[in-house]
């Protein structure tokens, strides 16, 4: 194996990977929806608080009108913080706009709508109670705001905003629900305080649900659609099972999810953004994936609560509604939550991606530009791999020098490839040429290349981040194809500096000639940040290789003169 062959293999692996990602796209414009599934609890599982066995479809609503509080039409409350604008009714967050993330870079662009009450593609977060022993519970419209007709806005001198709702039953049981928002945070604390002023025990359990109808844009894969490359679906985490996920298009494979988990969390992911329910630490919950009509549901159901007369209790959970910001996610101190930034389902590749992002973020804090941070990353990687690269370039320079002799050997032995190979290996041994010298530096770049691709696709910090001039968003393709064209030129020039092995198969030689064009076309569809990485990396490689060849040539001429003397 030689350097040229390794480069050919690397190129084909890259192209094959991208074609594989594109091959899996959904051909249909609509998602085939399975019927609602009824999921039961495995009987052998036991928890400190038993989780009831009920269906995983629509949220149960009590039918005993004598036990359910009156259900007047509840007004929708508007809440605005420095990062979120929401509509909520006490039972659900119906809509959520991310104020710091416009849909485009156009002036006056509207913010991203993560949760939405769009009737075609609704997406909401809901929490409520399910009765046991005929205890009264609030239904979809019985949480009333403590102050009606009021909109809430986080003032400039406030760091926290509390939005309270209340439900009261005829038998004296009441629940006060508060939504607590903090400045700069996307995690919302939702707390229920249950007080039993009646004469009979109150029994119920809490559920927390994410429900959405996926839009076709995230289901149909295409090389020109970065949203479709990013993982879209449900993910969950537990101490025992670790990080697990299920794509929307495979939502009910293997019978959905029906598992009791202590602690953990459950979330719905899309490109750059996610929602997640995070229960109290170590609280045992039943985790469910289900479908109800066209809706995909991710739900957790908490333990049953019994509140005796004259007693009170409290339960709370966090709801994340926002971007995949690594720094903010880390501050939540929730184990495994950083995996929502889904660099890869494979742990090793995910770790490489996390390491690359850590370097990029620190470079960005110094250079104040993500594009220059990518350039800086390339420089650091080239420095780190220079000892390996030096051996590669030295081997290439030697092979270039002895190329005429290899051609003579080829002409001498003609069609006898076995004798030619033996003579070639003897020459390599005599002149201390390592034909494998260029393999390892190229192979070691492969996981870095693919990990960086996912870093650029997944990192919301780079969304709409400019570099300079025509590159105004590093996560989208080069609009004028300048970087892909530069990549073609650099690869062509590198090929001219790299000696073609004398015994190389003619077909492989022709493939190597068109490889710059293939790579250039491929780079036209990848994020411009990745194309920038490849152009800078290739440019530095070309300069170093040119310098090493001339250095070796000067060294060889000097040794020849010394030998003559």
Swiss-Prot record:
Q: Which Pfam families match?
A: 60KD_IMP, YidC_periplas
Q: Its topology with respect to the membrane?
A: Multi-pass membrane protein
Q: Which residues cross the membrane?
A: 6-26, 348-368, 370-390, 437-457, 479-499, 516-536
Q: Does the keyword Hydrolase apply?
A: no
Q: How does it assemble?
A: Interacts with the Sec translocase complex via SecD. Specifically interacts with transmembrane segments of nascent integral membrane proteins during membrane integration.
Q: What does this protein do?
A: Required for the insertion and/or proper folding and/or complex formation of integral membrane proteins into the membrane. Involved in integration of membrane proteins that insert both dependently and independently of the Sec translocase complex, as well as at least some lipoproteins. Aids folding of multispanning membrane proteins.
* Protein's UniProt name: Membrane protein insertase YidC
From the UniProt record, report the name of the gene that encodes this protein: yidC
């Amino acid at each position: 194996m030689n350097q040229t062959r390794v480069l050919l293999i690397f190129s084909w692996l890259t192209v094959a990977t991208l074609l594989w990602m594109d091959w899996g796209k959904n051909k249909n414009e609509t998602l085939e929806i399975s019927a609602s599934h009824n999921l039961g609890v495995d009987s052998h599982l036991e928890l400190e608080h038993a989780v009831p066995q009920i269906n995983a479809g629509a949220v149960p609503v009590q039918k005993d009108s004598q036990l359910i509080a009156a259900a007047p039409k509840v007004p929708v409350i508007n809440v605005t913080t420095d990062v979120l604008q929401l509509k909520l009714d006490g039972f659900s967050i119906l809509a959520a706009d991310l104020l710091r993330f416009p849909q485009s870079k156009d002036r006056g662009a509207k913010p991203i709508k993560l949760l939405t009450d769009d009737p075609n593609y609704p997406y909401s977060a809901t929490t409520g109670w399910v009765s046991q022993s005929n205890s009264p519970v609030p239904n979809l419209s019985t949480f009333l705001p403590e102050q009606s007709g009021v909109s809430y806005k986080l003032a400039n001198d406030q760091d926290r905003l509390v939005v309270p709702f209340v439900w009261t039953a005829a038998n004296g049981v009441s629940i006060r629900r508060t939504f607590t928002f903090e400045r700069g945070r996307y995690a919302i604390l939702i707390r229920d305080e249950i007080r039993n002023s009646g004469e009979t025990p109150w029994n119920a359990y809490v559920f927390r649900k994410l429900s959405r109808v996926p839009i076709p844009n995230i289901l149909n894969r295409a090389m020109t659609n970065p949203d479709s490359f990013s993982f879209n679906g449900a993910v969950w985490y537990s101490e025992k099972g670790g990080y697990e996920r299920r794509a929307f298009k495979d939502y009910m494979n293997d019978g959905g999810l029906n598992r009791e988990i202590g602690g953990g969390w459950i979330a719905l992911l899309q490109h750059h953004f996610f929602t997640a329910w995070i229960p109290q630490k170590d609280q045992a919950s039943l985790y469910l994936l289900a479908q109800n009509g066209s809706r995909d549901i991710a739900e957790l159901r908490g333990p049953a609560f019994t509140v005796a007369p004259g007693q009170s209790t409290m339960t709370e959970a966090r709801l994340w509604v926002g971007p995949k910001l690594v720094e903010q996610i880390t501050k939540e101190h929730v184990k495994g939550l950083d995996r929502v930034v889904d660099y890869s389902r494979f742990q090793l590749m995910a770790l490489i991606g996390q390491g690359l992002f850590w370097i990029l973020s620190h470079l960005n804090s110094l250079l104040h530009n993500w594009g220059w941070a990518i350039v800086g990353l390339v420089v650091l990687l080239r420095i780190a791999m220079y000892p390996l690269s030096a051996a590669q370039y030295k081997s290439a320079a030697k092979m270039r020098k002895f190329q005429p002799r290899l051609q003579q050997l080829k002409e001498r032995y003609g069609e006898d490839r076995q004798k030619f190979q033996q003579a070639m290996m003897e020459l390599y041994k005599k002149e201390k040429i390592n034909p494998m010298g260029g393999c390892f530096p190229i192979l070691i770049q492969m996981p870095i290349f693919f990990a960086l691709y996912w870093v650029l696709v997944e990192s919301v910090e780079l969304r709409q981040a400019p570099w300079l001039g025509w590159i105004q968003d590093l996560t989208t393709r080069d609009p004028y194809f300048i970087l892909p064209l530069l990549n073609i030129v650099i690869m062509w020039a590198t090929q001219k500096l790299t000696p073609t092995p004398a015994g190389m198969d003619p077909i492989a030689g022709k493939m190597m000639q068109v490889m710059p064009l293939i790579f250039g076309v491929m780079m036209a569809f990848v994020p411009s940040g990745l194309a920038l990485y490849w152009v800078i990396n290739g440019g530095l490689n070309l300069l170093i290789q040119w310098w090493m060849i001339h250095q070796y040539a000067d060294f060889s001429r000097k040794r020849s003169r010394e030998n003559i003397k």
